[in-house]
Amino acid sequence: APSLSAMSDVEQGMDAYQVRRGNPNLKSVTYFTNRFSVSYRNKWMNVDLSARYSYDDKPIMEETIFENGKFVRTYANQKGLHRLMCQTSIQVRPFKEYLSINMTPFFNRYISQGNAYLHTHSNWGFRGSIVGMYKHWVFMADMNTSYHDLEGETITKGESIHSIALGYNKGKWAVQMMVMNPFTDDYHQGRENVSKLAPNKQLAFSKDFTRMVMLNVSFNLSFGKQKQMA
C-alpha cells in the first residue's frame, strides 16, 4: 500500500535537483495471482517444482518528470506489473538422517509497464544447504545468491550470503560456532533506478560482515521436582 505522503498533495525536496511529490488522485489496484506446484517424494529424495504468476492491474508505481528545472519523482496508476517466479527445490538424503543436501535454483521475470516507460528484468539465482549429523555433532553450510525485485522503475538487489557452522549438542547444553561469508571479501546490496530522465544507483557494502565469527552457547536449566503421570 502507498504511504500517506504518496497519497497527499505534498512536495518534499530531496536535493538541489530532485523533489518528491505525492498524488491525491491515486485509485485502487486489482491483483491477479496463479500458482502451480508439483511434488515427488521417495525414501532418498524430495523434488518440488513451483511457479507463480501475478499481475497488478493499474498498479501504483513511481514515475519521474522534469518540471521547472527539477526532476519530480511522484506516483501514479501505471499500466501493469507482471511477475513470474519459478523454482525447483531438491532435497537428497544419501545417508538417511545423517546427511541432507538441499538445492533450490530459481528464476524470476519482471515486466513493469508504466504510462511512459517499459522495463524488464530477469533474475537467476540459487539457494542451497548441507546439514550433516553424527551422534552429538552437527555440521551446517548454506548459501544464498542475490534475490532481485523490479517494481516501477526501481530494481532492488538483495544480499548474497553464505555461512558454515559446526555444533555439538549434548541435550542439556549445546555449543555452536558459525562463520559468516568465509569465502568473500565483500558484502553488499543495492537499488537501481532505471528512469531515462534521472537514473541512479545506490550501493550499501561492508567488509565487517565477511569472515565474521559467532559463538552460540545454550543451556537447558530445570528446577524443582518432576513427576511422571501414569
Descriptions of predicted regions:
Residues 1, 11, 32, 42, ...:
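Transmembrane beta-strands of outer-membrane beta-barrel pores
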Residues 1-48, 55, 73-84, 203-211:
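Outer-membrane beta-barrel signature, preferentially recognizing the C-terminal barrel domain
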Residues 3-11, 17-20, 51, 59-68, ...:
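Outer-membrane beta-barrel translocator domains and adjoining extracellular loop/strand segments
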Residues 21-23, 27, 46-103, 113-119, ...:
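Outer membrane beta-barrel strand-and-loop segments of large Gram-negative receptors
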Residues 26, 36-40, 51, 86-94, ...:
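Residues on the lipid-exposed face of transmembrane beta-strands in outer-membrane beta-barrel proteins
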Residues 30-34, 43, 80-86, 118-126, ...:
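Residues that define the transmembrane beta-barrel architecture of outer-membrane proteins
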Residues 43-47, 84, 95-101, 124, ...:
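Outer-envelope beta-barrel architecture signal
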Residues 170-230:
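C-terminal beta-signal and adjacent terminal beta-strands/loops
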